[in-house]
């Protein structure tokens, strides 16, 4: 599976589900598109905020959008957050936990049932700059404890894993 296949699969699930539960790989999930994003909107956001968003995040937003995916009947799923919400989301995550790492860390993903967050470490020179951060690790240790990967690779693994038949 490549990233285009993952985008196509997610879009198919979103269009089929439209917020209702559908059977995926032996589980029932709902999928919904919260917002579509254009190249112009991303460019304007980058200009207005003097910030360069990661290319794989921009590609996801253009091809799939801001979404709530893999929402189970007992789980909250995974939300990919629009760029306009990243700053406030980051403030809420780091509230009472020390320094807000925005814009060095762009938290773009919320996995609320587990208390996980995903984001891009912007100070990395590598394309492997996306990580999932866990609540049992103090935020001040997130960067040094994280095994960073490419966002596209994370997304492909997620789609493949969730769609496998049990």
Swiss-Prot record:
Organism taxonomic ancestry: Bacteria, Pseudomonadati, Pseudomonadota, Gammaproteobacteria, Enterobacterales
Gene3D superfamilies listed in its UniProt record: SMI1/KNR4-like
Domain of life: Bacteria
Protein name, UniProt field: Immunity protein RhsIB
Function: Immunity component of a toxin-immunity protein module, which functions as a cellular contact-dependent growth inhibition (CDI) system. Specifically inhibits its cognate toxin RhsB. Cell contact is necessary for growth inhibition.
Effects seen without this gene: A double rhsB-rhsIB deletion is outcompeted by wild-type cells, restoration of rhsIB restores normal growth in competition experiments. Restoration of growth requires the RhsB-specific immunity protein, rhsIA does not restore growth.
InterPro entries per record: Knr4/Smi1-like_sf
Organism, scientific name: Dickeya dadantii (strain 3937) (Erwinia chrysanthemi (strain 3937))
């Amino acid at each position: 599976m490549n990233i285009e296949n993952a985008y196509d699969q997610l879009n198919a699930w979103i269009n089929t589900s439209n917020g209702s539960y559908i059977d995926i790989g032996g589980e029932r999930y709902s999928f919904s598109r919260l917002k579509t994003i254009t190249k112009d909107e991303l460019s304007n956001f980058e200009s207005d905020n003097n910030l360069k968003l990661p290319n794989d995040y921009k590609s996801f937003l253009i091809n799939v959008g801001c979404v709530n995916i893999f929402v189970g009947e007992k789980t909250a799923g995974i939300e990919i957050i629009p760029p306009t919400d990243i700053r406030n989301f980051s403030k809420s995550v780091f509230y009472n936990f020390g320094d807000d790492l925005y814009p060095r860390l762009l938290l773009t993903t919320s996995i609320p049932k587990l208390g996980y967050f995903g984001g891009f470490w912007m100070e990395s020179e590598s394309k492997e700059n996306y990580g999932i951060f866990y609540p049992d690790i103090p935020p001040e240790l997130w960067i040094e404890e994280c095994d960073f990967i490419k966002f596209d690779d994370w997304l492909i693994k997620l789609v493949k894993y969730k769609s496998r038949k049990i």
